[in-house]
């Protein structure tokens, strides 16, 4: 056992003495030691109940002859951190989470790992850390919350509240309606109820085979979710000493491809691109941002979920057959785009896992021949504005897929929010938000507040927004993020001026500023990088080490 390094032989008597102080008995030193990486925190609705979930898991581990050791990671709630300086810390928290998993698991030489994530950066951070450790690992998330319902009977989610801010600013809804939306949108614990970043990543864990069936869609705080926890705990005990189930044997090139196929079929959050690039790097798997358009071209978008379709939420997807039904439909209709021989954590191949899966409601999960789109729900655009690429969630577009407009430039998200409220962005404009990339922020803030303002003010179909920052999974509209190179590293987005003409063609995968080479060269000569004070030592360190979004915004030590 790996854990023999802390428990076997007379030289390890001091180690055992400390372990005895934690309650271990003689017989425990012959059992596998399993790390239970929890992410319990009171301020995140998807995490406040994870303490109880860890107790269920630890109890099941003990019943099955292993010794659990629980530890916690930090967590940031992107919705609560949104719209103020707190959002600077969201993406950097992914690195802290990864480092903490690696640190605890390797410092104590634990044999296996079960991770309990749920929201935002916590799932990818845990995946990155687990891949560094490379022991048998299972992920079992806290699960999605139920959708909210207004007094009028309309189904809503957190994204509805963000958009209601814009509607209230534009006097399109009353104060009473506004308060009703605020109080109704998040009715229970769990990750926010649509196909936002949390549920996207928990779904992709299922697609990669590192989580059990239902991980992405079974509601939080349900009996079914509790049974999933127990199954996961039993399984980690079965495989704790089996090297076939080391996480790098599960998250392979095939698994990463399967994740991106499901991402395209379900119109996942644009943040998944950022995270999967980072996860692939930790797994030693080749994934280039340029590869994603090929996958998208081969995968129909068959499940449209909030915020792209506000009548459908994760519990609806679960009732309709879940992620397995989506994968089964894609595999039966779209050739060999899915890698069906990929190994899953149960020991089954993906093909075996999907053998009984079927769509139970074609209004929720469509057949390929009735797809929302013949191509996937995400796209990577290239052009002089994004020579290294940028990301758009095509599933969330509500207007035209081809757009030409005049730039209205803002040098921060705060500046943009004030400008939008004051009416500086009009129909036909391209709202440009820059110096919000991984280095420029630093921290690559999400732009949910400005996109939701535009949507709520009725401009969602008539305005494009481009940024070197990123978006919440709750964003919809013609919103282009992750522009690379970013403004802070000399990207063209930093050279734009008000009134410059910008063209976006989603189906041609292009984004272009209509400027001559001579004009661009002249602007580069005149360009002076704005200086931004960064008081935080951690954010200054992050700023120095972080790569741009086209590489997953990972910390680059080379």
From Swiss-Prot:
Annotated family: Belongs to the IlvD/Edd family.
Positions contributing to [2Fe-2S] cluster binding: 119, 192
GO terms classed as biological process: isoleucine biosynthetic process; L-valine biosynthetic process
InterPro entries: Dihydro-acid_dehy_C, DihydroxyA_deHydtase, DiOHA_6PGluconate_deHydtase_CS, ILV_EDD_C, ILV_EDD_N, IlvD/EDD_N
Primary enzyme class: lyase
Catalytic activity: (2R)-2,3-dihydroxy-3-methylbutanoate = 3-methyl-2-oxobutanoate + H2O; (2R,3R)-2,3-dihydroxy-3-methylpentanoate = (S)-3-methyl-2-oxopentanoate + H2O
GO molecular function terms listed in the Swiss-Prot or TrEMBL record: 2 iron, 2 sulfur cluster binding; dihydroxy-acid dehydratase activity; magnesium ion binding
Keyword Glycoprotein annotated: no
Residues bearing PTM N6-carboxylysine: 121
Cofactor: [2Fe-2S] cluster; Mg(2+)
SS bond list: none
One Gene Ontology cellular component: cytosol
Identification of the protein by name: Dihydroxy-acid dehydratase
Gene this chain is encoded by: ilvD
Free-text function comment from the UniProt entry: Functions in the biosynthesis of branched-chain amino acids. Catalyzes the dehydration of (2R,3R)-2,3-dihydroxy-3-methylpentanoate (2,3-dihydroxy-3-methylvalerate) into 2-oxo-3-methylpentanoate (2-oxo-3-methylvalerate) and of (2R)-2,3-dihydroxy-3-methylbutanoate (2,3-dihydroxyisovalerate) into 2-oxo-3-methylbutanoate (2-oxoisovalerate), the penultimate precursor to L-isoleucine and L-valine, respectively.
Cofactor stoichiometry and binding remark: Binds 1 [2Fe-2S] cluster per subunit. This cluster acts as a Lewis acid cofactor.
Active site: 472
Pathway field: Amino-acid biosynthesis; L-isoleucine biosynthesis; L-isoleucine from 2-oxobutanoate: step 3/4; Amino-acid biosynthesis; L-valine biosynthesis; L-valine from pyruvate: step 3/4
Keywords, alphabetical: 2Fe-2S, Amino-acid biosynthesis, Branched-chain amino acid biosynthesis, Iron, Iron-sulfur, Lyase, Magnesium, Metal-binding
Quaternary data: Homodimer.
Binding site for Mg(2+): 78, 120-121, 446
Keyword Amino-acid biosynthesis in record: yes
